[in-house]
Amino acid sequence: MKANILRTRFKSILLILGILALGFVASPRPGSATVSADGFQLGPEVVISAIDNEKYLPAVAYNSNHDEYLVVWQNKWPGNRDIYAQRISSRGELLSWFAVAPGPGGNPYDRAQPSVAYDPVNDRYLVVFIHDVFGDGSDWDIGGRFIPWNGPDSGLIEFPICTWNSSQWNPVVTYALAQQEFLVAWTNTPSGQPAYVSAARLNRDTGAVLDDFTISAGPENRINPDVAYNLARNEYLVVWDRVGGSHDIYGLRLTGSGVALSGGEFAIAGWPDNEEQPTVAACHNADQYLVAWQSLVGPPTNYDVYARYVSGDGVPGTVFLVDGTTAPEDTIDATCLQDGRQYLLTWQTMYAGGYYGIWGRLVYPVGMEASFGLVQPGAAADRTAPAAAGGQVNYLAAWVHDRDGTAYQDIHGRLIYLHQLYLPMVVR
């Protein structure tokens, strides 16, 4: 049972409107899904990778041409780290898995912190990551590799994205459909100076850097960037965590060509509590962003998760509590359906036994539904670090899944289907 506190759950008449508006959509296999009291369906839990090692930091992208997902993650082996991937159909079938990096053209040292985006024009993914330049941890750069939709091509080698002398961390990538290029953002940590956030526009065909520039710098550290692309305007919103007297969340809108829009950076969450580790998604049908974060309401470790709408023209709107109990809720992730009409938030929450499970919440541009459990913790094992992507009629959420009774960490996931309307079949 979840931590013992009465939880406020929001219900919305949009639940009914959503069923009527969505009409008929594809269903999972009969008997393969759990139907919630709120009408959505959870597909069966899927073991994405169970190789005997430790896995971290899953990231997910949706392939609109082939109606499938790609999950990437970081492996930790004795003595090294690398990046693997698994293709998964929109019905939850495992299609193929493969190594991403180190790949052709790269050094043999560690790769970590992957992020992935899909290019429907070239029908391939860009996976970005940090890599250990000298193998001693003294300099970490940003690299990338294009992966065709059905698996790696040895002719598509790793390429550099940022090779500055300062170390780079936590890269995130998105694809701009109208601009037909990628945007990558990351944190720089120059020696003896505050950390700051940078970005680069990448050519979709070659990976060449078209332009790189500073997103935000100043006397305080800027860390933990995330980025979303808004097709309605051909614009981006980059968000980050600014560390001053407390942690606050800021954002900056960019044109498709990377030019900062009027007004510059703006505050999204700046209250006395620490607001940390932002995530952002764009729903282009509503011309809107959803920014979420964890807020330290009970130091030192009791976080709640909050979210705020930001309009397409950069006006912060309603703030709402996503989940809050006397136990920590943190590490939140946001995504949106491909057609831009509904968000999904996923996060980890501590249960009464002290171990984490994964929860989620469907959010519309004007309201949200009740939160729901995706997976409970094991008897003595965590489920953490959720990530998700939205497809045409469902989402895929993935997480780090401690293997019960071992030191291994696997990657698991499950599909979340939209509200569906079933009519009885009449046989005459």
Functional labels for PLM-detected ranges:
Residues 2-14:
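Bacterial N-terminal signal peptides that target proteins for export
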Residues 20, 30-31:
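Cleavable N-terminal signal peptides
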Residues 13-25:
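Bacterial N-terminal signal peptides
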Residues 31-422:
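Extracellular, repeat-based ectodomains that mediate carbohydrate processing or recognition
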Residues 424-426:
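Gly/Pro-rich, tryptophan- and cysteine-flecked surface segments typical
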